A protein has these predicted regions:
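Sec-dependent N-terminal signal peptides
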Residues: 4-16
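Sterically constrained small-residue positions within well-ordered secondary structures
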Residues: 12, 71, 85-87, 138-140, ...
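Non-cytosolic coordination micro-motifs
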Residues: 20-63, 93-195
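Compositionally biased P/S/T/G-rich terminal and signal peptide-adjacent segments
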Residues: 67-90
Length: 195
């Protein structure tokens, strides 16, 4: 638990922001920001070799998943999303994950702590709490508990994913996720990604 508390402390400071920042690109996850080029971090050859998510039915965006680098201090995994046709690989979304296998209760507790602290950072943002079934699990047994902070240029979300036993068995552990997305990417997730 001490390690997790350290993660959460670092999680908040990994945004590298102040309470006065109102530009979504001011926030970082593991040093990466919205609007950065992936080419600033990886060669094009390396980018093309990364695992690409294949569960979206619409391919307007590409998500590189399961990035794990020795320099990462907070997250077990990082995912980055960019426009599929963008040759500069400009980042449109960043996600950081911490697993809570078989322990969704602790995920909820830690999410509440993170949300409270992020609420202070985004005091002027519109805040929304939601519980919903994950679109990817057609059985409806996988659930998401999410708090979103809406900014002019995008959103920050803190979520606990409670995957069904079937998906846990497919190596989908329950976990905490912090994400930063542009407004366009958020709209794509809502309206096109799974349709």
């Amino acid at each position: 638990m001490k390690k997790l508390s350290t993660y959460l402390f670092l999680l908040l400071f990994s945004f590298q922001t102040s309470s006065w920042a109102d530009d979504i690109s001011d926030f970082q996850i593991e040093g990466m920001s919205i609007g950065d080029s992936l080419l600033d971090y990886f060669t094009e050859k390396k980018i093309k070799k990364f695992f690409k998510a294949d569960y979206y039915t619409n391919n307007e965006y590409t998500t590189i998943e399961s990035l794990q680098l020795p320099s990462f201090e907070v997250y077990e995994y990082v995912a980055v999303t960019y426009y599929t046709k963008d040759k500069n690989y400009k980042i449109q979304g960043i996600v950081g994950d911490i697993d809570f296998p078989d322990n969704i209760g602790d995920c909820y507790k830690e999410k509440d702590k993170v949300v409270e602290q992020i609420s202070e950072l985004f005091s002027n943002a519109k805040k929304q709490n939601r519980n919903f079934k994950h679109n990817y699990d057609k059985t409806g047994n996988s659930k998401v508990n999410q708090t979103s902070f809406y900014l002019d240029e995008g959103a920050v979300a803190v979520s606990c994913f409670d995957w069904s036993e079937e998906y846990n068995d497919k190596n989908y552990p329950d976990g905490l996720r912090v994400s930063i997305t542009t407004s366009n990417l958020s709209a794509w997730y809502r309206n096109k990604a799974y349709k």
